[in-house]
Curated annotation (Swiss-Prot), chain B:
All residue ranges annotated as the ABC transporter domain in the record: 6-250
Subunit structure, as described in the record: The complex is composed of two ATP-binding proteins (MetN), two transmembrane proteins (MetI) and a solute-binding protein (MetQ).
Protein name, UniProt field: Methionine import ATP-binding protein MetN 2
Organism annotation: Oenococcus oeni (strain ATCC BAA-331 / PSU-1)
This protein's encoding gene: metN2
Principal place of residence: membrane
Assigned keywords, A-Z: Amino-acid transport, ATP-binding, Cell membrane, Membrane, Nucleotide-binding, Translocase, Transport
């Protein structure tokens, strides 16, 4: 068995499971980058989305200036290609993390790249909450906090759905973060691909696909399970 | 001091939509009495929705004064209450909507409990009250269902339970039956009328269907282009409408117009003979008791062929319509018509035979 594996997938086997450059390290770095940048970038994106929705003309606290500012920040960060953002913000990363290399340093550009993407998705989701529900809540004497809760709860299945989409695109971004030595499955595939070691490319790609399908599957299942509204 | 619970004085609502300036509500004066069911009728875009949203200040007026109960809420177009005070006022004004506006991700119980979120009652008391409200609207077996599992009528019942959670003195119904079928509409209106009777709840009901106000309203206002063009007791509006738009609404509710159109298409009416008249008679109140038709035959020898008849009871007063063909000699016919005019009956000569 082992001999057969060595014959068919020589470079996959020689990478080894453990060790700094083994498969487990690559998988761990991908999961690490995806998870933490999702939390940090997701939180920033969510805050911006809420600001955009409530300060909009038809929001509960309309404020043209705040909306304009938040909208421009999101648009600008959304417009910068990730591979460029990696280098543009590297001085900032240096100050924040103390280095510009490695998986932890990659969290900064990953978070800043995923935040505006997520903000726009959540903004669309929150805006799709029927204004009638908001009006009914106001008529019942609800305060602004109650209304924010309604926005979130009524769109929760949709929030799960767009979070899944965001998470999947984030896995894609972690592959590019290899350019700053972040490690991870994507980086492994690119590095070995450049050396024409295609067995690693295939196995690395399969591992990434498994991760993406798992995220998609769990997201779809969860969104369906918690939704009580009529399916559109 | 009047018993008004809602008092609007010279109220206007003005929107600026880009370069377009819209007067949604124009200089309205309206006093709604405590405990009455007040209907506001008009086509969409007449300003009904804007008008009722002033009551709970979901919309702000541009000018005028408003009193809700003993609270002055608007003076010279300035809203006097805000923040917690405004939210407390809103809790005393329930509102139901055409599309129910329930929280889809919450259960029936959850929807009602949401309304009690700011109540001073303990958690147990709130739960008890929410359950009682759900029971009152006849949905106790559906208490753990989500809105998507309910029919339109059931959804509106949940919305009513939710609107009543804080024991409001006023209930605003914004086209609440417009998305429901006739049978369910009737049930919901009966529920509202019953609430009004039992608890003295003041109901402001806006609709584009005269049928709805006919069944339950005590008074009716007809709105067009942001103005109230006619306002009277429901009975007077139906018995003696003044404005063409009011007549149009009433005809749409009674089916008289439809009947007349069918009659006019009949060949014998199309070829009405000499000394034959097609007339429409409108009876109301005590005039419905007089045996008019038989007296025409007895006293004038004029025969009356009844083609259509309809009696409706509004606020316990009957209102009737008859469409008949009168025939007799020319002189007798003239005398008969004069006699009808003398009675308390509205006469309309639709067609004269040649």
């Amino acid at each position: 068995m082992i001999n057969w594996l060595i014959k068919v997938l020589p470079n996959v086997v020689s990478m080894g499971w453990s060790g700094d450059y083994g498969w487990w390290a690559a998988i761990y770095q991908t999961l690490y980058m995806t998870f933490f940048s999702a939390i940090i970038g997701g939180a920033i994106g969510l805050v911006f989305a809420i600001i955009l929705v409530i300060s909009d003309d038809d929001g509960i606290l309309p404020n043209g200036k705040i909306f304009w500012l938040a909208d421009k920040i999101v648009s600008i960060f959304r417009a910068i290609p990730f591979i460029i953002l990696l280098f543009v913000i590297s001085p900032f990363t240096q100050v924040l993390i103390g280095t510009t290399l490695g998986a932890t340093a990659a969290l900064v550009p990953l978070s800043l790249s995923v935040a505006p993407f997520y903000a726009r998705q959540i903004q669309v989701v929150l805006k799709s909450v029927d204004t009638g529900k908001i009006e009914a809540a106001q008529a019942l004497g609800a305060n602004n906090w109650d209304i924010l809760v309604i926005y979130m709860r009524e769109s929760f299945p949709e929030i799960i759905r767009v979070s899944t989409v965001t998470l999947i695109s984030l896995v894609g971004l972690t592959a590019m973060a290899g350019a700053i030595g972040s490690g991870g499955l994507g980086n492994t595939v690119v590095t070995f691909g450049q050396q024409s070691k295609y067995d690693v490319v295939w196995i690395g790609t399969i591992a990434l696909l498994i991760l993406i399908f798992a995220i998609q599957g769990i997201g779809d299942w969860l969104a369906k399970r918690i939704n009580h509204a009529d399916m559109q | 001091m009047s018993d008004s619970i809602i008092e609007l004085k010279n109220i206007s609502v003005h929107f600026q939509n880009g370069s377009e300036s819209i007067d949604a509500v124009k200089n309205i004066n309206l006093a709604i009495e405590k405990g009455e069911i007040f209907g506001i009728v008009g086509y969409s875009g007449a300003g009904k929705s804007s008008l009722v949203r002033l009551i709970n200040l979901l919309h702000h007026p541009s000018s005028g004064d408003m009193m809700i109960g003993q609270t002055k809420t608007v003076k010279n177009g300035n809203v006097l209450i805000k923040g917690k005070e405004l939210r407390n006022l809103r809790q005393k004004i329930g509102m139901i909507f055409q599309h129910f506006n329930l929280l889809d991700q919450s259960t029936v119980l959850g929807n009602v409990l949401f309304a009690l979120k700011h109540s001073k009652m303990s958690k147990e008391k709130r739960l008890e009250k929410a359950k009682k409200l759900v029971e009152e609207v006849g949905l106790f077996d559906r208490i753990d269902n989500h809105p998507s599992q309910l029919s339109g009528g059931q959804k509106q019942r949940v919305a009513i339970a939710r609107a009543l959670a804080n024991d409001p003195e006023i209930l605003i119904s914004d086209e609440a039956t417009s998305a429901l079928d006739p049978k369910t509409t009737k049930q919901i209106l009966e529920l509202l009328a019953d609430l009004n009777k039992r608890t003295g709840l003041t109901i402001v009901l806006i609709t584009h269907e005269m049928q709805v106000v006919k069944n339950i309203a005590n008074r009716v206002a007809v709105m067009r282009d942001g103005e109230i063009i006619e306002k009277n007791s429901t009975y007077s509006i139906f018995a003696d409408p003044q404005k063409p738009l009011t007549k149009e609404f009433i005809e749409s509710a009674s089916g008289n117009q439809e009947a007349l159109e069918k009659i006019l298409r009949q060949p014998e009416i199309a070829r009405l003979q000499k000394n034959e008249f097609l007339i429409q008679l409108g009876f109301s109140g005590s005039s419905t008791d007089e045996p008019l038709i038989s007296s025409l035959a007895k006293n004038y020898g004029v025969s009356a062929n009844i083609l259509y008849g309809n009696v409706e009871t509004i606020e316990n007063i009957p209102i009737g319509t008859l469409i008949v063909v009168l025939s007799g000699t020319a002189t007798k016919l003239k005398q008969a018509l004069d006699e009808i005019k003398k009675q308390n009956v509205k006469l309309e000569i639709i067609k004269e035979g040649k």
